[in-house]
Amino acid sequence: MPGSVTEVSARRCAVAVLAAALLVAALLTAAAHAQPAPLVAEGSLGAGWRVAGLPGQKAPLTRYGVAQVDGRPAVRLEAAASYGNLVFDLPGQPAPQRLRWSWRMERPNAAVDLARKEGDDAAAKVCLAFDLPLDRVPFFERQLLRFARSQSGENLPAATLCWVWGHAEAREALLPNPYSRRVRVIVLRNKEDAPGRWFDEERDVAADWRRSFGDESAQVPPLQAAIVAADADNTGVTSVAHVAGLRFGP
């Protein structure tokens, strides 16, 4: 009898350990595949997506609406001498292996010049904001970031990587933002890509991270947010684009 009790206890212990292991694996899998909510749901912006401007911003906010374009539910980005980001917060979530979306240009911004402050606008961009540890940020930029955080009262990301629809810039060009090196942009589309046509994108996030910020951290840090945006506050013109189907993948 004692042996039987011992066997039963051992089996129960094994089952409990297995159940705990399966639960942990399920939680880790769920975290690894955490997704931003769909950009569009039931004819409106998806739950959790919010429009955010700059502290003390004087320019109007970029307008984000919903449209059906060629049968696709899409977000309409209209920038008119405006600034504003469509943000989905993902604090502490692991970065995805792949980032996918579709976009099309309707009215390009021919005044864009991503290398200069006066041309630093985009008719469409998709970004990931990363929670890079401050000790990885170069000293001078770290001090500027700390000051900006204290002035704004917001936890501004230490690293943001954007994939941008530019103008005259070459495809795959990598550029630091002219206002802050805490933002790097990779140009995917430009004036040679025809308006009124959908383009499907798929990016290797780790490869693009290493290319952009690899000198600061070879390891991809956790996310802070996913961002879809358009702005025209520097160029003062109007642009229109659509973005659809933003999703993470292996």
What are these model-derived regions, one by one?
Residues 76-96, 107-114, 180-189:
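Secreted extracellular polysaccharide-interacting domains
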